[in-house]
Amino acid sequence: MSYGFLATNNNNEVLVSSDTRNLHFLQKRTTPSSITYTTNFYGGMRHWNYNFTNVSVTPIPFFTTPTTDYYAITKVTNTSGNNWTVEVMRSGTSTSVPEVYLFADPRAGSPTDNYGMIVYKSDGTTSFDSRLKPLTVTGGQAVSHPTNPKSSYSSSGLTAKYCGSIQNYDTSVEYDISNFIPDQYNSYNISGQPSKPIFSYLSLAQAERELTLSESEEECDGVPDGYGGCIGIQRTYYWTSKYFAFYRGGIRWNNGNLRAGWIIAEKGCNWTYYRDTEFLGIGTGSDSGTGGNWPYSNETINTANNTVIISNGAKYD
């Protein structure tokens, strides 16, 4: 640029520039506004919404990690006007909840001090305002997620009949299974951790895995013919159940060690049933049915180059 303001550090990295807008602290929520989903099955999962008001530009959220589970921001929604909702997802069964810090460029802030340093863009709008608690980045990491959320998948213990391993569709009672719990991650060591680490990580990585089971049975209302057939009415039943888990990328923090792994975001199963009836080899009718919910596409996407930004929440408490 031929004019303006530019401040860099010893590594020639940009700290403040009149060409770009710095992030500044706006608001903090210590508890979620609502719990959108919770279960202790499949290793446990929690979905929370944090509501923010009076935010005039698109915000960037950061969160704490009070447990050593996996966390991720899965949605930032402009619900109406200047109102925003941040959805945070976490694995595990703990009752602890993360705090969420909201940052945005200085156009969204309202300074109360009369003194400080302000940097303007060429259009006259503010790019930096020291009175608004600018974001201090203490660390960062580009992370990638393993291609497979789990080292191996087994259908052991699952039934092909009516998805009966996870739900009784007559009583709506749910059951727990461990066949999809993720165990794969990539690990990164981060030096110089702050006193209260907060993280900006938007979950982009997604994966879906399925386990399909099929089973059939024959029933003879008559006399077996000795060759595997039936003299009389014969019914043949076919069942197929497709169990699935949908994963989102998450990060785990433990005293300077950062892991990029997976969180089960959704689970379910779809079943199909078919019955064929014959009398002396002649078809006399059939019956079929289906239930449950269909899985997503069985693929893995966006696993590489996901950015994690680290700051110190203590500066904004």
Per-range role (PLM):
Residues M1-N49, R90-Y243, I251, K267-D317:
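Extracellular receptor-binding modules and their adjoining Ser/Thr/Gly/Asp/Asn-rich linkers
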Residues T77-E87, W253, N257-A260, G268-N270, ...:
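Ser/Thr- and Asn-enriched, surface-exposed coil loops between beta-strands
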Residues S241-G256, G261-I263:
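Broad, structure-driven detector of short, well-ordered beta-strand segments within folded domains
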